[in-house]
Design a protein with these regions (language model features):
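Glycine-rich phosphate/diphosphate-binding loop of Rossmann-like nucleotide-binding domains
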Residues: 164-208
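Conserved short-loop catalytic and cofactor-binding motifs
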Residues: 11, 147, 196
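Alpha-helix N-cap/helix-start and coil->helix boundary motif
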Residues: 44, 84, 108, 205-206
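Glycine/serine-rich phosphate-binding loop and adjoining beta1-alpha1 elements at the start
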Residues: 73-170
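A glycine-rich (often HGG/GG-containing) alpha/beta subdomain
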Residues: 1-99
Length: 208
């Protein structure tokens, strides 16, 4: 995640929505794995898997195979969690308590999207279903009851607020947002709401 790996390393292991679906299907074909979910955002890459109790499984090695990476030097950027530690991590994550901006809203949506994508590709199972649903419920409760979840605690909102505090007027400024994914759309809308003239560009052209 953003605490352990710089942005270039995170980009190396990131998945698009399409690639994540294909990767989950391949991962579930691994002997002993009952279900898997890939959570890939700009700030983190996590692979969740339920598997046989007595199975020795290296999700890092599985990830490297999926990415065609043959280099163990990246392993220090990853951490493995199991059982209660893994569940607690997901609950904290869903509440925005492990985000760059404490209490930010996007991660809860990203967790729900990851679960839905796994459902579409038939790679989740009862254990991951219950775990992720409980995490989403906990995340909603935190955002409803905790003061840190109020307002607009996303990175882009904080950036625009900081510019305003420094005396920069966004009205009429020409801004370019690279990427039209979820965060790109949030960035474009936030800048537009602040009065900027916004252009959005994508890295790849896809017809149809």
């Amino acid at each position: 995640d953003h605490d352990r790996a710089p942005v270039d390393i995170r980009a190396l292991f990131a998945f698009t929505k399409k690639n994540a679906g294909e990767a989950m299907e391949k991962l579930k074909e691994t002997a002993g794995i009952h279900g898997c979910i890939i959570l890939s955002t700009c700030n983190r890459l996590e692979i969740w898997a339920s598997h046989e109790d007595d199975q020795e499984l290296s999700l890092y090695q599985c990830l490297c195979q999926l990415k065609n990476i043959q280099d163990d030097s990246y392993e220090s950027y990853f951490v493995s969690r199991t059982d209660r530690e893994a569940a607690e991590h997901l609950f904290y994550l869903a509440g925005g308590l492990k985000s760059q901006i404490l209490g930010e809203d996007q991660i809860l949506t990203q967790i729900k999207d990851a679960l839905n994508l796994a459902r579409e590709h038939f790679t989740t199972d009862s254990i991951l279903e219950v775990l992720f649903r409980m995490a989403v419920t906990a995340g909603k409760k935190i955002k409803t009851e905790a003061p840190l979840a109020h307002g607009n605690p996303s990175v882009i909102h904080q950036a625009v607020s900081h510019l305003k505090e420094q005396g920069y007027d966004m009205h009429g400024k020409i801004c370019m947002v690279i990427g039209n994914g979820e965060m790109g759309k949030v960035a474009a809308q936030t800048l537009r709401d602040a009065g900027a003239n916004v252009t959005v560009t994508v890295r790849q052209y896809r017809s149809g």
